[in-house]
Amino acid sequence: MTKHYLNSKYQSEQRSSAMKKITMGTASIILGSLVYIGADSQQVNAATEATNATNNQSTQVSQATSQPINFQVQKDGSSEKSHMDDYMQHPGKVIKQNNKYYFQTVLNNASFWKEYKFYNANNQELATTVVNDNKKADTRTINVAVEPGYKSLTTKVHIVVPQINYNHRYTTHLEFEKAIPTLADAAKPNNVKPVQPKPAQPKTPTEQTKPVQPKVEKVKPTVTTTSKVEDNHSTKVVSTDTTKDQTKTQTAHTVKTAQTAQEQNKVQTPVKDVATAKSESNNQAVSDNKSQQTNKVTKHNETPKQASKAKELPKTGLTSVDNFISTVAFATLALLGSLSLLLFKRKESK
């Protein structure tokens, strides 16, 4: 009898099971990659929406100016504090938007406020708009149209509290701590394109600085001449003494001349050293000025490069697109390979 692993039927079953495993693995890889790509795209969309919301909010805030203002709700016809004051958050805000003024306040237990109306000193009803209605916190932010100079508002409200069967309408007056002030216009966002700084052109030196040549004064040696000996005696002894005196004076004259020559050389030598030192220092100063000018030119040339780099926008989204394309391509190739193997094995089994 032939062994089971040599049986052709057994081999075909093993092949079909292997193909099923490969197909299931490929399908799971494709599904996993699609789920990952979908989650990544959702995160990108959420981040984009959050950024847009932040930008819109910052734009709205920049278009309006506000200032806090304190107030108190008092009973009608008296200066006694009303219970309505406890259901409003303090302080309020004075807002100027689109050249219009609003008094903004937040109502606590907003579900109790069935009706609220505000009137000015001339008993004219003021427009009221809801800015934010938070059902979870049970608060409501409202804007009441006002004008600069208003000191108080008359309020007519309808409050219903089902838990205690409270259902009443009453009139109160809202007193501001100070009159509604006049606010400055909001600073509009600057849409002016930034001016690119132009590199300053270095000034070309027109005249080259020449080293100053120090003036050297020639020192004239002072030679002292000895007086002539006029003793001319007739005796021989005296003439001998005079000749000796003349030789001594000549020797002294030559010695003094040599000393004065040496002193002149000594004077000329330090003067020359001072002149050379000054010329070297002047040349070094000129070279330092040139190096500073070249450094300034290089710095000014680098500034437009940095500005151009700042202009470049960050390349966002390219990495995620590349990952998406590579993943889809890999999954497609794997699926095609598994299908081709499956078709090939079916042909062999037939």
Swiss-Prot record:
Chain ranges of the NEAT domain: 62-184
Domain of life: Bacteria
Organism: Staphylococcus aureus (strain NCTC 8325 / PS 47)
Locations listed in the record: Secreted, Cell wall
Biased composition (Polar residues): 252-268, 278-296
Other facts noted in the record for this chain: Expressed in vivo during infection or colonization by S.aureus.
Assembly notes: Monomer. Interacts with IsdC. Interacts with IsdB.
Similarity annotation: Belongs to the IsdA family.
Propeptide segments, given as residue ranges: 317-350
Region (Disordered): 188-314
Modification type Pentaglycyl murein peptidoglycan amidated threonine: residues: 316
Binding positions (heme): 75, 82, 166
Example of a GO MF term: metal ion binding
Residue stretches of biased makeup (Basic and acidic residues): 299-314
PANTHER family: IRON-REGULATED SURFACE DETERMINANT PROTEIN C (PTHR37824:SF1)
Protein's UniProt name: Iron-regulated surface determinant protein A
Bias (Low complexity): 203-214
Topological type in the membrane: Peptidoglycan-anchor
Consequence of substituting residue 101 to A: Does not affect heme-binding
Leader sequence residues: 1-46
Keywords of this entry: Cell wall, Heme, Iron, Metal-binding, Peptidoglycan-anchor, Secreted, Signal
UniProt effect for mutating residue 102 to A: Does not affect heme-binding
Principal location: secreted
Keyword Cytoplasm annotated: no
